[in-house]
Amino acid sequence: TLQQTICREGTAVLTDRQNLLLQPGESRTVSFRYCVDSPALWSPENPNLYTSTMQVLEGEEELDREETGFGIRTLSIDAAHGVRINGQTVKLRGACIHHDNGILGAATLPDAEERRIRQLKEAGFNAIRSSHHPAGRALLDACDRYGVLVMDELSDVWNVRKNPYDYALYFEQDWKPTIQKMVAKDYNHPSVILYCVGNEISEAGSESGAETNRRLCNTFRELDPTRYTTNALNGLMAAGYRLREIMGDVMRKFPAQPGPSGGDGGGSNALNSFMSLMSGEKGDYFATHPLLTEALSGCEDSCDVIGLNYLTGRHVLEHELHPHKAVLGTETYPADIVRLWRIVEENPHMIGDFTWAGYDYLGEAGCGIFHYDGGANFSSIYPERTAYIGDLDLLGNRRPISYLREIVYGLRKAPYLAVLRMEHNGQTSSKTPWMFKDNLSSWTWPGFEGQTASVDVYSASEEVELFLNGASLGRRAMVDFTATYSVPYTPGELKAVGYTGGV
């Protein structure tokens, strides 16, 4: 006898059984079909879960059992309504996360994964991207429990390598069984809504790359038609042979800009060093170049959702080019959150934004570390080991950018104060677009009495007023959720009050 029991919070919702007669060595597929009355639906706000227990019985003796968790929800993604869970539109407040848990290493430890997901959810994120690997089961279990949506990612390379001896050696022979295992792993996890077929793929702008993209997307759809596909496209990588002409146009448009500098070795360090120069107006000009549109078109055509890494200038343009496709910022600069989220809120086809990164990680050492001695980022300067660019640091502490993001999302009402480190007053630091500001929420700076501190107030209010030891330092209008004060340091209490409509 095969018996299945569906439970919610330990209480049986329904039970059914089928009697089977099997000969030795015989196997059989058995199907159960149910109607759950008034189901408790799974969503990011209410992550209701069920458990299916399948038992093999001989009489009433249990010979074997298997338990599987699952959630009941509907999912749709389109350009008119964005992501809808159970019919309700959800904007993806996304965090890219790497595979490691800091000094614990790359092992998937259930308690560590739960802690990481809980902290990200508490910081305002409702989605993660498993950069750049299929997520572990413990991570998905935590996302199911906390109501965090998942973009699960296949690989960082296809057939063209980024580093010697990387996965490109095995991709062609392994991609199909890997997708099969990935879909089987994800199938019953309600948190998983997107399959990402690759990250910053070198051959994405070629005909062969477009065909590989189509094969990968079609395989995901065949195995799991309930979810959607995307590809995290990087313009510098996808441009291919067109890059020289595009960059020639960029440099003619912005002639005063220096060439790439810093960064050791190849792979992501070399790419990131070059990308440091491709932000702001220059980045937007690059992102919207007609030759880049040509390069990206093949992969964009065969994905359900257009995914863009550091191509913010294309977020609105893509709707003109592909009016029936949703668009997603699959990887973006942290400090651009105000502009990025404004685009997300104002455009139904923009389904969300994934910052790089939600949580600090090992590798790409020094990407976000401020150097005041002339040192360059991406140069692996001893003893740097972490990237130091997460909204949360390696210990799980929230950094000021995290609170600004929470305010921009509309999830935090109270103002937040952050002070540039006073020991570096007047000094010039290194800078990459993954860095925010070298500030922290502290008004304790012994030895700097009388020196001027640069104080940021982050708030969604129209105005803020800053007080030092009860004395007003004046009101300031907010510009992009920020007001900046120059304050002579005096020990005591620094406090901000927000005002909207004068109150």
Predicted segment positions?
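Substrate-binding clefts and catalytic carboxylate motifs of secreted carbohydrate-active enzymes
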Residues: 22, 193-195, 214, 218-222, ...
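The substrate-binding groove and active-site-proximal loops of carbohydrate-active enzymes
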Residues: 40, 44, 96-111, 119, ...
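Positions that flank functional sites
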Residues: 135-136, 157-158, 235, 359
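An active-site-proximal structural segment forming one wall of the substrate-binding cleft
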Residues: 171-189, 223, 286-291
